[in-house]
Design a protein with these regions (language model features):
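Small-residue-biased structural context
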Residues: 1-117
């Protein structure tokens, strides 16, 4: 039911998204801010979506307004992923050379590995 879906999302958030957001905010977004001027709006929007998800998880766990919250979180996460796929990743590929991309990739993997422990 709904509570199980809320619990699944909460676990997914803690097991995957916390480290994913940290990796983006500490490594990927600063690199793109420095390397590709004019994209602050997109990066700020993605960070804002991260913050919305961070703030919603405790509400999700409390069970308050669960049906609407589960729907809203699913919608927000889907929009966030689409923005990354359509705007962020192509920007990265167009402006970051393979050497720098390999270094960044290793740093992202390090942060994601830390998050899974």
């Amino acid at each position: 039911g709904l509570r199980e879906r809320a619990q699944e999302f909460s676990e997914f958030y803690r097991n995957n998204l916390v480290a994913h957001f940290r990796a983006e905010e500490e490594v990927l977004f600063p690199l793109l801010r420095d390397s590709v001027p004019g994209n602050d709006g997109m990066l700020d929007e993605l960070i804002g979506q991260h913050e919305q998800l961070r703030q919603a998880v405790p509400q999700l766990e409390s069970g308050a307004g669960l049906a609407k919250l589960v729907f809203d979180l699913g919608d927000l996460l889907e929009r966030h992923i689409r923005k990354e796929e359509r705007e962020l990743f192509p920007l990265f590929e167009a402006h970051i050379d393979s050497t720098k991309a390999a270094i960044i990739g290793a740093e992202l993997i390090r942060i994601l590995d830390e998050g899974s422990k």
